[in-house]
Curated annotation (Swiss-Prot):
Taxonomic lineage of the native organism: Bacteria, Pseudomonadati, Pseudomonadota, Gammaproteobacteria, Enterobacterales
Mutant lacking the gene: phenotype: Cells lacking this gene are constitutive in the expression of the treBC operon.
Record's subunit section: Homodimer.
Organism: Escherichia coli (strain K12)
InterPro entries reported in the protein's UniProt record: HTH_LacI, LacI/GalR-like_sensor, Lambda_DNA-bd_dom_sf, Peripla_BP_I, Trehalos_R_gpbac
Protein name: HTH-type transcriptional regulator TreR
């Protein structure tokens, strides 16, 4: 059986010093791109990751997990992270934060760095474009949040249920001309599932659907709300709080105050600025807690990967 390679071995095979290998492992500056690529190629060729004892000697915690968010400024993801952190701290784990910016390539790079650092596990906020092959190494030590993948642990929101709750509330209030502002179907959860839930409710209750799917940004809500407002429209359902905030700004500027807004999110900013908007809480805080607890249970051998659905509740 082949002996495990050490940092000294990687340095020798790469033709560099041990300190250079250490800087590459920790993704630190001070290493040329050419040298970094040469060291990484050697590590990948030999499947190298530092031992826990080596990490401890470098002053690193023996219990480290990573949280990869899509955007550091995401209101919903921050609500989930706020409940993850105490759960990890309580069990002695040091969390590190990374950002994917909805880039599968960045996720792959982050996972490569984390693999080389031999961390304990990862919570990954999922999005369209992440493949199961990309995650293969992490099957027993990763939890996906807001997306699911076969064979992997996941914590997902009930997207269809959230829309159904809001549509039912608006319908019960007497609204029969309910428009929809959402996200393209390339986003499977926030986009496709929520829009299809809106269409299904309209079909079941014989309502005429009027929808636009511009994207996630507040500005897109602002710029596209006029496309879904007809003279008959009495209510507007937005797939996210950010879209609702953009739509609300447009309606205020146009002095339209008879339209009932509804949205999925219930973030603190929305509740403070627009308490009149009907919202559902998808369970961001609970999802964060569940994701942290599931990951800890997996890496300590107390649980196999499980798929968890967080129910939405009317705020």
């Amino acid at each position: 059986m082949q002996n495990r390679l050490t940092i000294k071995d990687i340095a020798r095979l790469s033709g560099v010093g041990k300190s250079t290998v250490s800087r590459v492992l920790n993704n630190e500056s001070g290493v040329s791109q050419l040298t970094r690529e040469r060291v990484e190629a050697v590590m990948n060729q030999h499947g190298f990751s530092p031992s826990r004892s080596a990490r401890a000697m470098r002053g690193q915690s023996d219990k480290v997990v990573a949280i990869i968010v899509t955007r550091l400024d995401s209101l919903s993801e921050n609500l989930a992270v706020q409940t993850m952190l105490p759960a990890f701290y309580e069990q002695g784990y040091d969390p590190i934060m990374m950002e994917s910016q909805f880039s599968p390539q960045l996720v792959a790079e982050h996972l490569g760095v984390l693999k080389r650092r031999n961390i304990d596990g990862v919570v990954l906020f999922g999005f369209t474009g992440i493949t199961e092959e990309m995650l293969a190494h992490w099957q027993s030590s990763l939890v996906l949040l807001a997306r699911d993948a076969k064979g992997f642990a996941s914590v997902c929101y009930d997207d269809e249920g959230a829309i159904k709750i809001l549509m039912q509330r608006l319908y019960d209030q007497g609204h029969r001309n309910i428009s929809y502002l959402g996200v393209p179907h390339s986003d499977v959860t926030t986009g496709k599932r929520r829009h299809e839930a809106y269409l299904a409710f309209c079909k079941a209750h014989k309502l005429h659907p009027v929808a636009a799917l511009p994207g996630l940004a507040m500005k897109q809500g602002y710029e596209n709300v006029a496309k879904v407002i007809t003279p008959e429209t009495t209510a507007l359902l937005c797939a996210t709080d950010t879209l609702a905030l953009g739509a609300s700004k447009y309606l205020q500027e146009q002095r339209i105050d008879t339209l009932q807004l509804a949205s999925v999110g219930n973030t603190p900013l929305m509740k403070f600025l627009h308490p009149e908007i009907v919202t559902v809480d998808p369970g961001y805080a609970e999802a964060g807690r569940q994701a942290a607890c599931q990951l800890i249970a997996q890496v300590t051998g107390r649980s196999e990967p499980q798929q968890i659905i967080i129910p939405a509740t009317l705020s």
